[in-house]
Curated annotation (Swiss-Prot):
Keywords: Chaperone, Cytoplasm. The gene is groES. Together with the chaperonin GroEL, plays an essential role in assisting protein folding. The GroEL-GroES system forms a nano-cage that allows encapsulation of the non-native substrate proteins and provides a physical environment optimized to promote and accelerate protein folding. GroES binds to the apical surface of the GroEL ring, thereby capping the opening of the GroEL channel. Pfam families: Cpn10. The keyword Chaperone applies. SUPFAM superfamilies: GroES-like. This is Co-chaperonin GroES.
């Protein structure tokens, strides 16, 4: 099977889905101890890089999403689908998995 090359800028989420670039995990503890990859906690914060058109309502209209491209968001720990593109980590989430917008 041939590998498919996908450019991040071409990803277009469907419905109420949001494509988020995951912030890097902390590599050191507060005391300065380096953590191995398997001991690092999965980050729950990232930057929105693409949003879907919104959830379709019963009347056929779409509900606008509360977040937009460029927003930093906090999301549920085990939510979404993890995606790796061009060596970077991303997660595809439903809007309901977003807990907060972070300034």
């Amino acid at each position: 099977m041939a590998a498919i090359s996908i450019n991040v800028s071409t990803v277009k989420p469907l419905g109420d889905r949001i494509f988020v670039k995951v912030s890097p995990a902390e590599e050191k503890t507060a005391g300065g101890i380096l953590l191995p990859d398997n001991a690092q906690e999965k980050p729950q914060i990232g930057e929105v890089v693409a949003v879907g058109p919104g959830k379709r309502n019963d009347d056929g209209s779409r509900s606008e999403l509360d977040v937009k491209v460029g927003d930093k968001v906090l999301y549920s720990k085990y939510a979404g689908t993890d995606v790796k593109l061009s060596g970077e980590d991303y997660v595809l989430l439903s809007e309901k998995d977003i807990l907060a917008s972070v300034a």
